Regions:
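Short Lys/Arg-rich amphipathic alpha-helical segments
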Residues: 1-173, 177-211
Length: 211
């Protein structure tokens, strides 16, 4: 199976831009709330809107360093609710849920593939490559505009593949023991490095990671 070729250069700013975008009502919500989230010092990961009355509006967000806690989620929720009430990207009642991306997180930025290189992921393409849309394997980062993965293809040895971001419809980490350990270790290090924080994570921090 051949790598899908694309040659682009990407700045560090572009590497943190989301390339996975919502559609429909979720896209309308994103256009309203993303500037608010960024003004609070966080970044949007993913939005999902489900149900009818009330609609469930699920928002995944995080700090630029990948962390977030329950207090952060409550702060963001309080800021977003009045914005949604005023701008009304949809009609009717809704319930707002703000959370972390979780350990088996969606991968929505080029930097996500770099940050979690070496861990397993599932990737779904918007159109088939060599007759298939779904791939699973070990992330090998992001290079020349492509997501790199050592893919398991059923028979034979895994193959090094690359997919341009324009083809990525969905990408998510696979929950493994190694991923859980790595995520918790990273969170502890970042938590202990913040001014005014102790070296230990509390139960809320761990719960946020596991959501």
């Amino acid at each position: 199976m051949a790598t899908v070729p694309v040659k682009t250069t990407m700045s560090s700013a572009q590497s943190t831009d989301r390339f996975v975008r919502e559609s429909g009502i979720a896209a309308s919500v994103a256009s309203v709330i993303e500037p608010v989230i960024e003004s609070l010092g966080f970044r949007l990961v993913r939005i999902q809107v489900s149900g009818k009355e009330p609609r469930i509006v699920q928002i995944m967000t995080e700090r630029p360093d990948g962390t977030i806690n329950i207090d952060d989620c409550e702060k963001i929720s309080k800021q977003l609710s009045p914005v949604l009430d005023v701008d009304e990207p949809f009609s009717g009642a809704y319930r707002l849920e703000v959370s972390s991306p979780g350990i088996d997180r969606p991968l929505v930025r080029p930097s996500d593939f770099e940050d979690w290189s070496g861990h397993e992921a599932k990737i779904e393409l918007s159109e088939p490559v060599d007759g298939r849309k779904r791939f699973k394997g070990v992330l090998e980062g992001f290079e020349d505009g492509e997501v790199r993965i050592l893919a398991e293809l059923g028979e034979g040895d895994p193959q090094h593949l690359g997919f341009p971001v324009a083809l990525i419809a969905e990408a998510r980490l696979v929950l493994t023991d190694e991923l859980i350990r790595e995520a918790l270790n990273r969170a502890k290090k970042k938590h202990s490095g913040r001014p005014g924080d102790g070296a230990e994570m509390d139960e809320d921090d761990v719960a946020d990671l596991e959501d």
